[in-house]
UniProtKB/Swiss-Prot annotation:
Organism for this UniProt entry: Mastigocladus laminosus (Fischerella sp.)
Membrane topology label: Multi-pass membrane protein
NCBIfam families recorded: PS_I_psaK
Annotated protein name in UniProt: Photosystem I reaction center subunit PsaK
Protein family membership: Belongs to the PsaG/PsaK family.
GO cellular component, one term: plasma membrane-derived thylakoid membrane
Length: 86
């Protein structure tokens, strides 16, 4: 009884498309821009091989901003899917 109720409430799975990839890339760019303006010491910690290529970020700042970008992108993608935009 409970299993059939849960299955009836489940949504259709989201299929990957280039639009999903573009949204994730845009969310990561927004997160990196946000991190660039708000991280107090962006070059702290171990340096990256070509720090100017990564905007002067150290490894911790780069990992933090891209992790935040993926969390933000996942929320945007799932939110748009929930609204029926995908």
């Amino acid at each position: 009884m409970l299993t059939s109720t849960l299955l009836a409430a489940a949504t259709t799975p989201l299929q990957w498309s280039p639009t999903v990839g573009i949204i994730m890339i845009l969310c990561n760019i927004v997160a990196i821009a946000f991190g660039k303006s708000t991280i107090q010491y962006p070059n702290a910690g171990p340096a990256l091989p070509s720090s100017q290529f990564f905007g002067g970020f150290g490894l911790p700042a780069l990992l933090a901003t891209t992790a935040f970008g993926h969390i933000l992108g996942t929320g945007v993608i799932l939110g748009l899917h929930n609204l029926g935009r995908f």
